[in-house]
Design a protein with these regions (language model features):
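N-terminal small/polar loop signature for handling phosphorylated ligands or for N-terminal nucleophile
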Residues: 52-77, 83, 87, 101-105
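Short gly/ser/thr-rich secondary-structure transition/capping motifs
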Residues: 1-6
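Serine-dependent acyl-ester chemistry module
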Residues: 90
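Alpha-helical macromolecular-interaction surfaces
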Residues: 33, 37-40, 62, 70, ...
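Glycine-rich phosphate/diphosphate-binding loop of Rossmann-like nucleotide-binding domains
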Residues: 10-54
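C-terminal binding/interaction regions
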Residues: 22, 94-113
Length: 113
């Protein structure tokens, strides 16, 4: 069971906190819903959100780093990569994951993705 043992979810309290949502532009039909959901969650927590758009998921770490170094107290990175018949999916996902993890470790700013 994948949900077994999961913690109960409650809206965190982040009154006045600045959160940057970094979102890729590819697959806008899907991304629109993801961005709207992220903004809703940030708002419910009492934080202030801004949105920065990346060309694609590969570029998310660069913009996440800029947001973290620019004063964001947390970064939410959103991207959609659809698996096809080539290894492109693996390359992009690995680079984005490694890069976003590196941003969090290097800056001390939480990066959710």
């Amino acid at each position: 069971m994948s949900g077994s043992g999961a913690p109960e979810q409650s809206a965190p309290h982040a009154l006045g906190m600045r959160v940057t949502v970094v979102a890729a532009q590819w697959h806008e039909r899907i991304m629109g819903g993801l961005v709207a959901g992220a903004l809703r969650a940030v708002e419910e927590a009492g934080a202030q959100a801004s949105v920065v758009r990346a060309v694609g998921s590969f570029e998310l770490p660069v913009l996440a780093a800029a947001a973290a170094r620019g004063g964001a107290k947390a970064v939410v990175a959103l991207g959609v990569v659809i698996r096809g018949g080539t290894p492109h999916f693996d390359y992009v996902c690995r680079a984005a994951t490694d890069g976003l993890s590196r941003v969090a470790l290097d800056t001390g700013v939480p990066v959710g993705f």
